[in-house]
Amino acid sequence: MEVFMFPTGTTVIISVLSVLLAVIPWYLLNKLWLKPKRFEKLLKAQGFQGEPYNLSVLKDKSKQNYMLKLQQEDKSKSIGLSKEAAPSIFTPVHQTVRKYGNNSFLWEGTTPRVIITDPDQIKDVFNKIDDFPKPKLRSIAKYLSVGILDHEGKKWAKHRKIANPAFHLEKLKVMLPAFSHSCNEMISKWKELLSSDGTCEIDVWPSLQNFTCDVISRTAFGSSYAEGTKLFQLLKKQGFLLMTGRHTNNPLWGLLATTTKTKMKEIDREIHDSLEGIIEKREKALKNGETTNDDLLGILLQSNHAEKQGQGNSKNIGMTTQDVIDECKLFYLAGQETTSSLLVWTMVLLGRYPEWQARAREEVLQVFGNQNPNNEGLSQLKIVTMILYEVLRLFPPLIYFNRALRKDLKLGNLLLPEGTQISLPILLIHQDHDLWGDDAKEFKPERFAEGIAKATKGQVSYFPFGWGPRICLGQNFALLEAKIAVSLLLQNFSFELSPNYVHVPTTVLTLQPKNGASIILHKL
């Protein structure tokens, strides 16, 4: 009689191992060699050029190594203001474009990053938000997840709708006194540093960071201002740890117990608990029928409450507490970083080009005299606006936008395979001679005398705040804050670049002066 024998545990294990030993080599071969080479062949067939793929790119940490090198380099090594900023900021992209031209690509591990510089193709990328989503956050970058910036599809649309009222111009007008108050406090501190002849030399960068932190703390949290300031310091620490973390893009990060990861977890928990406490107090007051504050958080919670009421309080409608926490992070990271970057480069360039500083001051005094700026007058500042636009062209807060393809797609006449990443190098496009003329790298605010559309000839070649449906919600906030700050500074001081100023633009979360910004102030 034949007896059926069930496989023993050992037999099962051997069978599983045999399958794995057969599958894993093929998986690795495809992932590490065959698939990247197919990408390369397809891209080169369409006229793209780049370094040939080889296994050495898996060890290539050029971006991380560059960041570390930049942190350690001698501060006396200066980059002249007349030179483009790109080589010192994002060397891999710049060097790729310089070597292979605009139609080029580079490798990030096994993933090709295609560099797109054609305005029509850029327009398509920005407009077709479902086809060209942002890359998914990996590893510790999740600790700086900033709300609506990271969302896609229906969740993005819902959050955009709820957050939008907080940034309407009518709401922002109410916040203008807070902008002026914070800036006047900074100016008062600077005046205390003046010598008997009414001058002093100061690194304005830390002061401008504190000013924009002060503004966002007041306008985002109102009466919770002190808590807001503490949150800013915590988020600043998170940003520093993220940018200096060696394993940020390592998919195995979650399995690694590292000091940086542990610190980021601790800070994230502290941020979460602080924001949760602020939000719960506000929501309780809202439910009790108390008047909401006219700060960003109050308007956001009111809008969220209205959305839930309109949909029958469904749990799937509106923002959760965690969603609101993420949006509060965005208030800080986007609101503070963007404006401080814009202001410091504005002072640097106006310090270098005194004729434009004089023209801007004349305009400010003509519109406001020695009074605090008001909303009606801000709309009349044509020269100041031209200057700010030109500063954003030469020194945009972000130096590139990335997008990821989750399916094969056509972009103009290009066929891009699933898995490809797209890079829109803002800095290079803003200084492209073909798009902006032979004076593309020069500071010439007059190019914006008739507005952005005229300066760009209707092309998508200028996008410091993004473009299309996902354009930055806070751009009006940032520009109003910058106009008020520039106006108040010009009313109180003339200023020039110090001989001690060393021009080394670098990117942390935004484009910043690595060695600070030494400015000589003269009291007016």
Curated annotation (Swiss-Prot):
Main location: membrane
A GO molecular-function descriptor: iron ion binding
Keyword set, alphabetical order: Heme, Iron, Membrane, Metal-binding, Monooxygenase, Oxidoreductase, Transmembrane, Transmembrane helix
Binding site for heme: 472
This enzyme's EC code(s): 1.14.14.115
Bilayer-crossing regions: 9-29
Cellular compartment(s): Membrane
InterPro entries xref list: Cyt_P450, Cyt_P450_CS, Cyt_P450_E_grp-I, Cyt_P450_sf, Cytochrome_P450_Monooxygen
Name of one Pfam family that matches: p450
Listed GO biological process terms: 11-oxo-beta-amyrin catabolic process; glycyrrhetinate biosynthetic process
Function recorded in the entry: Involved in the biosynthesis of triterpenoid saponins.
Similarity section: Belongs to the cytochrome P450 family.
Name under which the protein is recorded: 11-oxo-beta-amyrin 30-oxidase
Annotated gene: CYP72A63
